[in-house]
């Protein structure tokens, strides 16, 4: 079973993921990983002003486009960083963010810029790891599907079915 550790901070040099127990011989399609990363990119100007290119760099565990069985390290450099935007928030935790929790956990030594290690930016390495896992699942002929349903409509259909007997 693959195991992963994400690393980096929102306004540090990079974020990334280290995957262990990746089977040897798994083809690594960097274009597929990039396409998956594009799906998590902001889709409208109101969500965030930050726009990262999200180009994945394979640092280890892959040779000639195939995993070697050693840990796979994927890196995404942070390029669109404006840390000064967070100067005023250094001593003021934002509501609905992990700022205060990070401050308590680190004894006040947390990186407050952009949420640090608790930023949405850390979803990028999770998506990269997921793309690699998805490639492995496909080779095993395992498909994962999901859908969003209207719970009220589902309850109504169930009630109608009960009434019909």
Language-model features and meaning:
Residues 1-165:
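Generic N-terminal targeting/processing segments that precede catalytic cores or assembly contacts
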